[in-house]
C-alpha cells in the first residue's frame, strides 16, 4: 500500500529537537515501512506543491496531519483523512483565530482520525461531522527508542519536558525545587536560571528521560500529548491537568490528574 503523510512543513522530519507532530509522523512512517508499506512524507509549506507531490506519488491513502491544510481535502483525488493536534480542541472558548479552521472542518466534513473520544465528540457536536466520518486513533510511541532503567539517577525529581510556552505555562511552577524543565523557550516569563536543562536533542531524550521519577505536564489545553506516551515508554509516572488526561487510565497509581481549579494551589 502506498501512503502519503502530509506534515506541517514548518520543521524538518524527523525533528532534531522539539516537534511532537513531526516525531509522530516519523514514527508512523517507520512503523508502516516495517509492515511493508511504501510511505512518502510531504512536508512543504506550499499548498500547490503539496498537491503536486501527492499526485506524483499516486498513493492509495493520504493522511493530513496539519489543520491548516484541511482546505486541501477536496483537492486530493485519493482516499484521505485528517488528524488535528490542536491543543484547545476541547475548549471552544480558547479557539480565537482557530475558529476559521473549525469552520472549514464544519463545511468540508472530512474523514477525521480523532485523538480521543472527547475530540470525536467535538467534531460531532460543534462541527456537525457525521459519526461515519470519525475514527478514534490515539497517538502511539516507538517504545524501542527509549532507554528504561529500574533505578533512575533522579528518582525524587520530576521533569517538565515540553516547549516552554503560554499553553504549557511552566513559569507558574518554578517555585517547586524538585521540578526541572527541558524545552525550547517561547515564553519570556520563564526564568531560565531556575532548574532549566536546556533544549534536549532526540538522542538525549531517548537516553535520559528514564532517569527522572515523573513527567509533569500542566497545560491549560492538550489533545493527546505524545510526551505522556514517551514518559511511559521510559518508565516514568505522569502528573497532568484534566486537559491532558485523554486516553489515560486515571485509576493507575502512577497517573495523577490535577483539576484546573487546583492549579493555583501548587
In which residue ranges do the predicted regions lie?
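Conserved donor-binding/catalytic core segment of Leloir-type glycosyltransferases
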Residues: 113, 150-180
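Conserved acidic donor-binding segment of nucleotide-sugar-dependent glycosyltransferases
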Residues: 199, 252-264
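Acidic anion/phosphate-binding donor-loop and adjacent secondary structure
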Residues: 92-94, 124-125, 133, 138-156
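Short hydrophobic beta-strand element within catalytic cores of glycosyltransferases
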Residues: 237-241, 247
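Aromatic "clamp/platform" in nucleotide-sugar-dependent glycosyltransferases that forms part
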Residues: 220
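A short, active-site helix/loop in glycosyltransferases that binds the activated sugar's phosphate group
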Residues: 91-95, 100-133
